Amino acid sequence: MENKYNLTREQNVFVAKRNIVNYIWNSATLEGIKVTYPETQAIYDGGIVNGLTVDNIIAINNLKYAWQFILETEDIECDYKLLCHIHKLVADKLVLDTDLGKIRTTPVNIGGTSFKPQFPIESQIKEELVEILNQEEKTKTEIAIESMLYIMRRQMFIDGNKRVAMLFANKIMIDNGCGIITIAKEYQEEFYTKLIKYYESGNMLELKNFIYTYCIDGINL
């Protein structure tokens, strides 16, 4: 799986900033938040939007702050510590303070499937994450996608796992000039179908190829 884009970090940040509202909108709709692009733009700009719940507005603002962190911090290693920090940004004011950036201690259910994620063990997650991130034979794009899907299926946090997973993966992508992973609205239904299949089987190959083919944004220079 080759890198689709070969940008400098500066170029990749430029692409991300130019399309940031669209990426936030895609993430919000992926989570089932019924928000329009203009509403997302208004929230991003600090405006008032009627018709959305307070939690939905908080979720969108949290995505904004998390993206800003990803784009503005270059010299931070992609590891378990960063993963937990991203969760603090994504889930702020949406979960109990005691759950922010912490491994969940209660069961979670996933809609659309009978799959039950096992309880996360911190030492095991750290070890598994290191193994994924240090695959020298694979490109950074493939490592980013695999880490994202691993985090999604592991469901290590009480809430916000997909958002955390995608932001973590995009930190890898951007730092290495590989573009941006984003699930556009027209691909979300198929993405979810393949995601459920992956949850139940544990085999990520089909979903990984789908994301690589349809869900990486960037520019060719």
Residue ranges and their predicted role:
Residues 1-221:
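FIC/Doc superfamily catalytic core
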